[in-house]
Amino acid sequence: AELLGLLQEQTERMSRMTKVLLEMSELRSVPCEDDIELGPLSEEVLTDLAPLAEHKDIALNCSGCALIIGSDTLLYRLVFNLVENAIRYSRPGSTVNVSICDNNSHVLLRVEDQGPGIPKQYRESIFQPFFRLDKSRSRAYGGAGLGLALVWEITALHGGTVEVETSSENGTTMLVSLPNRSVALTEQ
């Protein structure tokens, strides 16, 4: 029975991985030309992830709003992956914060968790497909090692950047910088 459970778990993991790989291969065919209100989109992500957060006794907060041009489907996936990771790695009883601000040329999206942090030497590698900090984290937190690679690709498609802004044993802040609507319109 234990072996059967393990096989089922691995089959489900492979299925999820295949789905994400297919998503990644089709990214460039998705049009990125809609006006997107990032605040309401982020609130929708938090609503969809609320059951996972409640299960881990994690509060979710979102503040700010900004208008960008892009694909709502892809930007939803970007925010979803960042917030899901933040929930996955945060300590029970903590808070995941999503903040959005427009600094006149770029929209800054920050996702802040209260997890174990990311060592300095891995802060760029985490965006590579299948990268894992270590196998024990992989087993403890799940995932296929593709979520942040997908975030990287989606951000690049929208003309932006993503990075680990800060990280310590008290948590991590991921920063996504995307051209705001006025900059995106002048670049078209």
Which residues does each predicted region cover?
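Short alpha-helical segment of the dimerization/phosphotransfer core of two-component systems
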Residues: 6-14
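Short conserved segment of the HATPase_c
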Residues: 118-132
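Short helix-loop "hinge" at the ATP-lid/N-box region of the Bergerat-fold HATPase_c
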Residues: 86-87
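Acidic ATP/Mg2+-coordinating residue in the GHKL
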Residues: 113
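Short conserved segments within the C-terminal catalytic ATPase subdomain
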Residues: 52-62
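Conserved glycine-rich
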Residues: 159-160
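Short beta-strand/loop element within the Bergerat-fold HATPase_c
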Residues: 93-105
